[in-house]
Amino acid sequence: MDSVIRALQPYFERIPSVERPKGHVHFREKFGWTAAILLLYFILSNVPVFGLSPESIDIFAAYRALFAGSTGSIIALGIGPIVTASIILQLLVGAGIIKLDLTNPEDRAAYQDFQRFLVFVMIAVEAIPQIAGGLLKPDLNLAAQLGVSPGIISFLIFIQLFIGGVLIVYMDEVVSKWGIGSGVSLFILAGIAQSIVVGLFNWVIPPNSAMPAGIIPRWIWIAQNYPLDQLFTGSGLAFLLIQGGILALITTAAIILLVVFFEGTRVEIPLAHAVARGARGRFPIKLIYASVLPMIFVRALQANVVALGQVLHARGVTIFGEFVNGKAVSGLMFFLQPVSSPYDWIPSLVKSQGAAFAAIPDWMIYLHLLIDALILVVGGIIFAWFWVETSGMDARTVASQIAKSGMQVPGFRKSPQVLERVLSRYIPKVTILGGAIIGILTLVANMLGTIGNVSGTGLLLAVSIAYRFYEDLAKEQLTEMHPLIRRMLGEEA
């Protein structure tokens, strides 16, 4: 397959892309591009899809914090196509089906060009089944008013979703090449931050509920409607912890502190410049070396599988499971859908959601929790390994970059091979350990719940992305000081 990719690369190269800057982009300009794209993202998230029926179902609603975007908007697909394309490529490379040497600049260019092409394919692949499966429904009243068939409205819905997906791709490229960090991370952080703020202060009372959705308004409502002696009983404290949102608040704060701690835990390899006498530094290998981005791939893979089951269920195919209110209640899909709150694994809370949920046996609920734990931990390790190998973070690539900057490990011969041996002592082990830790943290956060229902995965992503964004800001300000620093950090002067 790699020969096919190389043969088709001239055609992939013709796909328009954002041009890379030819020199160093100053910090103010990078910050300006980042802020402009963020503003555009929020504007697009409030542009509704023309002709979409209010009865439509968002199959990615439970993963909205992960995929960014906004339900019912033209960017409803969010970063889903980008993530799905990355998953497919990483699996193909990991399985040896695509045998490209990603340390070779030509092979890496072919890989990236094919990835861009695959993203556009995935935009169509993710939009068409939702429309054809009857989940994204055309507005029949609008079709009657315009005197056109519902099929025409469905086609317009597809065009809008495709345009929105393409805009997300190019907005990501603008941030990655001209801004700070990556667009994917920026969109995730923006969406999760918005959800947390809404989860804290939302005064709106949801349907079938007597309490406001936001935690702070909910506390005020509880204080006005419940006497203290009732709240300080066993059932009252359980009510405050779960329905009152105290457990979600504690979990959110604890996960933030733990992620910051693990992000700051690292092994530092001393470096010295071969020419500039006295110039020394350290190469940090973080405990969460692959960051939490591989966890996106784990959840995205789950989301696509469960979404396929939901599309089939909408077409009357229930062999893989039945869905009620967007949640699987039977079959394979029940075990594969993620745990996102106490209402997904505590039997009494699961069964309180309706008659269909009350019929689920306890053993199925506990087995669902066990399977999700295995998916998170094992999947976190596998995708962390794939991410390191395919994103240029492996020992060989890092050693080559350090050698090109003129740095070496004191007391060792100046050679990329020597550097690679030193780095190989740490990077593979830290990659596996970090992937497992992120999987466990995600599981705990999902089990206990979070503010704004952003899910444990979303919260971990938000904290890690914010931490890395802070580091990127510090790095950008540092590179403004002198061209030599930019060369040592692997940037063009």
Curated annotation (Swiss-Prot):
Subcellular localization(s) per the UniProt record = Cell membrane
Q: What is this protein called?
A: Protein translocase subunit SecY
Q: Which PROSITE patterns match?
A: SECY_1, SECY_2
**Lipid bilayer topology:** Multi-pass membrane protein
Q: Which HAMAP family match?
A: SecY
* Ranges of the Cytoplasmic topological domain: 1-21, 89-109, 177-182, 267-291, 388-430, 470-493
Q: What is its main location?
A: membrane
Q: Which residues cross the membrane?
A: 22-48, 60-88, 110-134, 152-176, 183-201, 245-266, 292-313, 368-387, 431-449, 455-469
Say if the entry is tagged with keyword Transmembrane.
yes
Q: Which UniProt keywords apply?
A: Cell membrane, Membrane, Protein transport, Translocation, Transmembrane, Transmembrane helix, Transport
Which Pfam family, an example, fits this chain? Plug_translocon
Organism the protein comes from: Archaeoglobus fulgidus (strain ATCC 49558 / DSM 4304 / JCM 9628 / NBRC 100126 / VC-16)
Q: Which InterPro entries match?
A: SecY, SecY/SEC61-alpha, SecY_CS, SecY_dom_sf, Translocon_Sec61/SecY_plug_dom
Q: Which residues lie on this side of the membrane: Extracellular?
A: 49-59, 135-151, 202-244, 314-367, 450-454
Q: What does this protein do?
A: The central subunit of the protein translocation channel SecYEG. Consists of two halves formed by TMs 1-5 and 6-10. These two domains form a lateral gate at the front which open onto the bilayer between TMs 2 and 7, and are clamped together by SecE at the back. The channel is closed by both a pore ring composed of hydrophobic SecY resides and a short helix (helix 2A) on the extracellular side of the membrane which forms a plug. The plug probably moves laterally to allow the channel to open. The ring and the pore may move independently.
User: Is ATP-binding one of the keywords?
Assistant: no
Intramembrane stretches, per the record, are 60-67, 68-79, 80-88
Q: How does it assemble?
A: Component of the Sec protein translocase complex. Heterotrimer consisting of alpha (SecY), beta (SecG) and gamma (SecE) subunits. The heterotrimers can form oligomers, although 1 heterotrimer is thought to be able to translocate proteins. Interacts with the ribosome. May interact with SecDF, and other proteins may be involved.
The family note in this entry says: Belongs to the SecY/SEC61-alpha family.
Q: Name one GO cellular component term.
A: plasma membrane
> What is the primary gene name for this protein?
secY
* Gene Ontology BP terms: intracellular protein transmembrane transport; protein targeting
